[in-house]
A protein has these predicted regions:
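Accessory recognition modules or surfaces
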Residues: 1-7, 164-181
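SAM cofactor-binding core of SAM-dependent methyltransferases
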Residues: 1-74, 78-85, 114-117, 192-213, ...
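Active-site glycine- and acidic-residue-rich loops that bind
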Residues: 84-97
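Flexible, glycine-/basic-rich loop-and-beta segments that form/coincide
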Residues: 171-200
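Anion-recognition interface
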Residues: 216-233
Length: 235
């Protein structure tokens, strides 16, 4: 990707467009065209105000794996440079809906559930309705994303605490390294061996999950009060 080209990005779970959003850093560093998707209308209106002079579109529709491709098509983002997903729910199913619709960004990032280290797999599934999820049972594990990424020709290149970054293999530069087969190593580098207790203090009471065996973790998850057998799978 040439730095001089316009970066087209889609921020799914954009919030107010500033805090935890990719819109601000990208717009300050590159020529951008963006789509900010956020169902919280008040937050989206704040984003609309601060980016009124930018080539940004705004969407407050609730997304699901079925309608996501139509929404991206409606706003003209069928070939985006970068897609970010952070909805704290069926994030992986939403990503599947995008990639299986042949919308293949050069880069995507997704928030992972940091309490499930590779090789353990966990995900919240979409079952036809929007149901909020809460810590510690939300989103998906890093390994679950890596499996989908490998299938769709993407490489895991970085993990910044609970945000994983993937690059389409045809866009990989020579200085980038794929961690698809070494996801546990990257998890240790990007999360486990860093100051996560300071940044994620609410995770400390689940620290024993990080050291559990497969059998132990399966039991811990399924007996947790937030576990929903109809929507959550650990495998």
């Amino acid at each position: 990707m040439k730095i001089s080209e316009v970066i087209e990005f889609v921020d799914i779970g954009a919030g107010d467009g500033f805090n935890m959003s990719i819109a601000f850093p990208l717009s300050k560093s590159f020529a951008t065209r963006g789509l900010l998707i956020e169902p919280n209308v008040k937050q989206l209106e704040f984003a609309r105000r601060i980016y009124k002079n930018y080539d940004f579109s705004f969407c407050s529709e609730f997304l699901d794996p079925v309608n996501i491709s139509d929404i991206l098509k409606k706003f003209g983002f069928l070939n985006p440079t970068y897609i970010k997903i952070d909805i704290d729910s069926f994030d992986l199913d939403l990503l599947r809906g995008i990639l299986h619709s042949h919308i293949l960004p050069k880069i995507f990032s997704i928030e992972i559930n940091e309490l499930f280290p590779p090789p353990f797999k966990f995900e919240v599934k979409y079952k036809g309705e929007i149901v909020p999820c809460t810590s510690p049972l939300f989103g998906c594990s890093l390994q679950s994303v890596v499996d989908l990424a490998t299938e769709m020709n993407y490489s895991l290149v970085s993990l910044a605490f609970n945000n994983a970054f993937f690059v389409y293999n045809d866009s990989m530069r020579g200085d980038l390294k794929s961690y698809n087969s070494k996801s546990r190593l990257l998890y240790e580098i990007g999360f486990l061996n860093r100051n996560w207790r300071e940044l994620f203090p609410w995770d400390i009471k689940y620290e024993h999950w990080l050291k559990a065996s497969a059998t132990q973790l399966d039991r811990l998850v399924k007996k947790h009060e937030g576990f929903d057998e109809a929507r959550m799978i650990i495998y």
